[in-house]
């Protein structure tokens, strides 16, 4: 079997790209209403501690003045249990162009959000774990910086990793179904799993150095050589 150097090179390029992705700038704006639950405030405060210098979390009080939303904001979080200011403030944040989610204890507190849209959502929960799991999925659905977000915020890593593994599994399943020559799918699947390995390393804040990436490619090449022997 011919060793697909091109496929392995593609996997390495994907890994280098993933390393760059993990260093992308991430900007999160958090607006805290005076009615916000202390438990929700504490959960978000503990969860949004950046692990790299590429992430920045901006925090501001929600009051009668118009919310200031920087143009580079990736997502905005509004912590509130309902107030007279909430609807107008949220509208202003969305109009500024930032995907916005309101975190509350009950949907009754935020009646103007009836269902999620690409730009606006509501997560209502009194359970810290459930709140953060839902928030992780909500953000991942609305950003193209999944690796950077997960590398910075630990509560997002499981959701991001699950998506990476599922995507690789679906790719390999489709490859296996479409390739009719025995063994011909092996190089493609190996390359996909190398890429997945590098992406998972970045998601968990432990990016592989390029020397280790070439090591992994060498192991894959040796496996292919033995298979073809």
Enumerate the predicted regions with their spans.
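Extended, compositionally biased accessory segments flanking or bridging domains
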Residues: 1-61
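Flexible, charged surface loops at secondary-structure boundaries
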Residues: 20-25, 68-74, 94-96
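Structural motif
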Residues: 30-36, 78-83, 103-107
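Canonical P-loop GTPase G-domain recognition
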Residues: 40, 53-63, 97-148
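A short, well-structured beta->alpha microelement
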Residues: 45-74, 80-91
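Active-site helix-to-loop segments that bind/position phosphate- or nucleotide-bearing substrates
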Residues: 143-160, 164
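Membrane-inserting effector segments that mediate pore formation, membrane fusion
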Residues: 159-229
């Amino acid at each position: 079997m011919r060793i697909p150097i091109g496929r392995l090179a593609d996997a390495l390029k994907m890994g280098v790209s993933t390393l760059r992705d993990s260093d992308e700038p991430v900007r999160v704006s958090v607006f805290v209403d005076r009615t916000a639950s202390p438990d929700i405030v504490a959960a978000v405060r503990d969860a949004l501690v950046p692990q790299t210098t590429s992430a920045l979390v901006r925090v501001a009080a929600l009051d009668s003045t118009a919310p200031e939303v920087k143009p580079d904001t990736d997502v905005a979080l509004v912590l509130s249990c309902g107030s007279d200011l909430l609807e107008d403030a949220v509208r202003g944040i969305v109009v500024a162009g930032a995907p916005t989610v309101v975190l509350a204890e009950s949907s009754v507190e935020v009646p103007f959000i009836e269902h999620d849209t690409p730009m606006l959502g509501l997560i209502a929960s009194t359970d810290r774990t459930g709140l953060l799991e839902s928030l992780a999925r909500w953000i991942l659905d609305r950003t193209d910086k999944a690796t950077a977000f997960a590398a910075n915020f630990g509560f997002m890593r499981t959701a991001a990793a699950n998506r990476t593994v599922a995507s690789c599994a679906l790719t390999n399943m489709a490859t296996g179904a479409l390739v009719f020559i025995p063994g011909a799918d092996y190089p493609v699947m190996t390359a996909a799993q190398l890429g997945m390995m590098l992406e998972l390393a970045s998601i968990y804040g432990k990016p592989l150095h390029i020397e280790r990436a070439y090591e992994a490619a060498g192991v894959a090449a040796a496996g292919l050589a033995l298979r073809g022997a």
